[in-house]
Amino acid sequence: MLMTLLILVVSSALFLYWFRYTVILILRTRPAPDYAPQVAVANHLSFVEIRQKLHAPVETESLGSFCKALQQDYRMLKYLLGHAATGQAGRYTVEQRLLMANFRVLALCCAMVQRFQPNAAKTALLEMSSILEYFANVMGSRVAALAGEAARA
């Protein structure tokens, strides 16, 4: 019984380590053309402005509104990725699914700690905005590829 519990704990710890490391590696990859600002402006998304505000001193009361705004941006980008008129519509890659799971965990953590540990909430919000930037770049590259195909036709 003790050995089973030990194996379960160690396996869970290794899975969490792998998950975090994989998410960090995915977020560190940057595409050559950065489409995130254009996608954010075109779709009225606020993650770019929120990221800029988070790099300055922020009042604790505004963290909750930032979290809600990022969740709204997440829903919009997820909808766009799932319904874009490309060959990849409705399908998410493994990387995108990992980032979606991480976003939901970060949103939950942010909601739980924003009053008691504002710096931890700020860190979670910054990572949430990085995930949204990744999704915006994916969306922008899909649109650019589609525009390139239309120009060749």
Give, region by region, the residue ranges found by the protein language model:
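Short, charged/polar, low-complexity loop and linker segments
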Residues: 44-58, 76-89, 113-115
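Cytosol-/stroma-facing membrane-proximal "stalk/adaptor" domains immediately downstream
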Residues: 90-153
